[in-house]
Amino acid sequence: MTTSDRGLATLRCALGALILLWAGVLIGVSFLAAPAKFNAPSLSLPVAMDVGRQEFGVLNLVEIGLAILTLALAAYVRPGRLIWLALGIAALVVAVQALWLLPLLDARALSIIEGETPPAAPWHALYIMLEVLKLLALLVAGWLALWRLRAG
């Protein structure tokens, strides 16, 4: 194995690690921290909504950064079609959330914080479904990236 081959293998390993880091951040915030705050009996709904707005705003910025880094590294190491497909799905979900869904959820949360009762809307359920889709895409991409290393 040449030095160049070792360097590419290292970058491919870094790609798998970066993808799984992104998945871990997503699990930690969306699937652990966010639901836990709504189980805190001393936290009122408006306060929990305000914390959630901040929490998911920061998560979205972190995910945009992770998506850019991951896609840039993938462009360099050329990981294969299935990994590209999975990363594309994850990045598309982040874009849809940032540009469309989070602003809708933010406006809804603000109305609840102000004491209003907004009409029922499917946005939160859609957000959860997209989080699950994104997580599955990242886990598939990470597994494939690391499997490809093992296969040579």
Regions found by a protein language model. Give the residues of each.
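C-terminal transmembrane bundle of multi-pass solute transporters/carriers
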Residues: 39-41, 50, 59, 74, ...
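Membrane-embedded alpha-helical segments of multi-pass transporters/permeases
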Residues: 31, 95-99, 136-143
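Structural signal for the C-terminal ends of transmembrane alpha-helices
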Residues: 72-78, 143-149
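Mid-bilayer segments of alpha-helical transmembrane spans in multi-pass integral membrane proteins
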Residues: 91-103, 131-134
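Hydrophobic alpha-helical transmembrane segments
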Residues: 58-67, 124-139
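Interfacial loop at the N-terminal end of multi-pass membrane proteins
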Residues: 2-68, 103, 109-117, 121
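Interfacial segments of alpha-helical transmembrane regions
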Residues: 5-23, 73-92
